[in-house]
């Protein structure tokens, strides 16, 4: 038997993305965003409400996008709960350290295994309450300790987390269970 539910924001899994920008005075800022994903091969999209981060993006047009992990979950949750407009020292409270990105004017926080440097290319459906942001990925930074034997990022090593919008929780992503564009070959005739 199956149960029906009214429409909800239950696309699963939802990433826990940490958006890094600089405030007008050069202070690093970050926010937690779950509504985002791949837009095209070298582009991402993020659904944003009105935040200090949105103001920073309107001013600078550049950001970093990091992937939260089991180890960064508490601080990642905090930067999603607290507004940079009301708590200007919120990054200091997390203990995160950052340096300016090599390819964008945005902070790269040292505690995340993988970070994308991005430049805003388009805003869709912009209103007083927010917008859909399309950004070009100009570089991807991965800490070498999270690389697989083939030299590419290893998701299993990262212990990435996903947002559970149904029960308001965070879950770690699981183990590899198959090969994309390979496991299904056994059903091909």
Short names for language-model regions:
Residues 1-189:
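Basic, polyanion-binding surface patches
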